[in-house]
Amino acid sequence: MKGTLLLLALLMIGELGFHTTEACVPFFAGYAGVISGSRLWLYHELSAFNGTPKETVAYEKIQDCYKEQGVKSQTLEPQILASILVTPECLQYYSEETFTKIKDALKKISQH
């Protein structure tokens, strides 16, 4: 189900007219907030998108699913996301400093 959600999110980004490379960092920041298990982190990441209260509740429910799945789910997801992040398109668009920040954030998540 999570893989389907990820695919759906990536397709939606493309359909809304964004360049996928421009959406890499915001997508991963939001996704990291979801799988972190921290409501505070989730709210911080979602605040950048000015979402509606219903959207926030939906993300909270997704976060609850990750909490229910346990540590295995939370540690595998950052590894998968990190491998997606280093696609040639994303590497061309963002600086090395940006990638370092994202990788550090993903490492923090996988350590919890």
UniProtKB/Swiss-Prot annotation:
Family stated for the protein in its record: Belongs to the secretoglobin family.
Keyword Secreted recorded: yes
Recorded superkingdom: Eukaryota
Distribution of this protein across tissues and organs: Expressed in lacrimal gland, at higher level in males than females.
Species of origin: Mus musculus (Mouse)
Keyword terms: Allergen, Secreted, Signal
A GO CC term assigned to this protein in UniProt: extracellular space
InterPro entries: CH2-like, Secretoglobin, Secretoglobin_Domain_sf, Secretoglobin_sf
Keyword NADP: no
Main location: secreted
PROSITE patterns: SCGB
Signal peptide coordinates: 1-23
Protein's name in the database: Secretoglobin family 2B member 24
